[in-house]
Amino acid sequence: MKRVWPRIPTISNVCRARSIYSAAQENAYRSSVKLIQEYSEKVHKKLQAKLLENPSETSPEIERLQVLSQINLPEVRSKFHKKEIDYTNPVFLYMLKQQWEDYQKLLLLQRLEQMKVIKDSGIGSFSPSVDVQLGFNPENNDSITPGTILPSTVTVKTPWLSVLPFNCKKNHYSVITLDLDVPNYETNRFETHCNWLLTNIPIEASKRVPIDTSKAFFQYRPPIVHRGEDKHRILTLVLRQKSSSISIPSNALVRERFDLSEFCSIYDLEPVGAHLWRSGWDSDAVALLSKHPSVHEYRDIRVERIPA
């Protein structure tokens, strides 16, 4: 006897279930958006009341209310996901800060601790609060990953620098680049030399352009690494100024044996951002550095063996 299998309408049941779930999800989404908009309007009214009390006020409480009134709106989240960033809006700066703290800040701090940069530079306790992007190719915006070893063909050029503070205020900064591993064969110690120094740089989040490096107290000088030396740690620090302008006499500073803590103390500077890369000797170093205008003389140091 031939067995007959009953026909089960599985496809129609699945489609029916999917349509039920889709309708439920759509209703849940609309209800969520309605709640978000109601909360946003409530916070916005509180913000308007604060601004009516003092229209010129730009306190942290005002920025907090601006962020709360927009951060959960679907259109704001969509623009942030598509990288349509409005740098004049505090809510986008807040989300950028969250994104930066979740990865880039942790990576930077890990490299600084791993390579003992904080201890050897003398900056003491340090918690960066601005995003520092640095690169050597002006044709693209690809920043160097902190701790990367770069060849001399790259580092012989003046780098570009971009700083993003996560607030709408305009502040003035100084930027300094230090070589932490310059050997002194007479004292058998390592010294810190200054490779680059910029001062009185106005920076605000709304103006996303690379820093003007044409006016510098010390023009950029590439790191000088001789044959046989280990990799040099090149630290770039962004220092926030208390005033819009600091005046440094032309003969007050020298590149050699640079004391960072004393420099920050004299001119009242606060480290708020950093970047790190490394440089080593390679076959192109002699030819490139000998032609650089900031390097007066490049020659391999002759190290004699200490007599027994």
Curated annotation (Swiss-Prot):
One of its GO terms (biological process) is mitochondrial translation. One of its GO terms (cellular component) is mitochondrion. Its main location: mitochondrion. Keywords: Mitochondrion, Ribonucleoprotein, Ribosomal protein, Transit peptide. Residues 1-17 form a transit peptide. It comes from the Eukaryota. It comes from Schizosaccharomyces pombe (strain 972 / ATCC 24843) (Fission yeast). InterPro entries: PEBP, PEBP-like_sf, PEBP_euk. Component of the mitochondrial large ribosomal subunit (mt-LSU). Mature yeast 74S mitochondrial ribosomes consist of a small (37S) and a large (54S) subunit. The 37S small subunit contains a 15S ribosomal RNA (15S mt-rRNA) and at least 32 different proteins. The 54S large subunit contains a 21S rRNA (21S mt-rRNA) and at least 45 different proteins. This is Large ribosomal subunit protein mL38. Component of the mitochondrial ribosome (mitoribosome), a dedicated translation machinery responsible for the synthesis of mitochondrial genome-encoded proteins, including at least some of the essential transmembrane subunits of the mitochondrial respiratory chain. The mitoribosomes are attached to the mitochondrial inner membrane and translation products are cotranslationally integrated into the membrane. One of its GO terms (molecular function) is structural constituent of ribosome.
